[in-house]
Amino acid sequence: MTSLESVSPNLAALSQTVSESKTPLPLLKAALADFRAHQHTAFDNGTSVAELITARAAFIDHILALCWQRFNWDENLSSLRKSRISLVAVGGYGRGELLPNSDIDLLILIERANAQHHSSNIQSFLALLW
């Protein structure tokens, strides 16, 4: 496995449908189930564990980016630096090593002065992931 598309060939279609959907959760759950099945098949066919855990982290990166992009994080549309909030992967996932039953550890880093500005989006984002 060398690319994310080879791991999950429907990512472009998933990106489009998730961005347009009012209810993305069923689409995301189906994509995760398809990805798990694909990984089981790849493992059975001899794909190295190192490749599988790296591909899993890359796939989750893509899913999280789709979820994150559903929200408007911009605070200052006239500035070059529009937002002062970041989603950061930490732990094994942050190292690009995501085992099948590992937690997905995330940190939302935000400038203290802007914390209230994003509270509703953060709550909705976390609810979507939960």
Predicted regions and their residues:
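Amphipathic alpha-helical segments in well-structured domains
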Residues: 122-125
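A general structural signal for short secondary-structure junctions and capping/turn motifs
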Residues: 79, 127-128
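N-terminal regions immediately upstream of nucleotidyltransferase
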Residues: 1-75, 79-83, 101
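Catalytic metal-binding acidic patch
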Residues: 86-119, 129
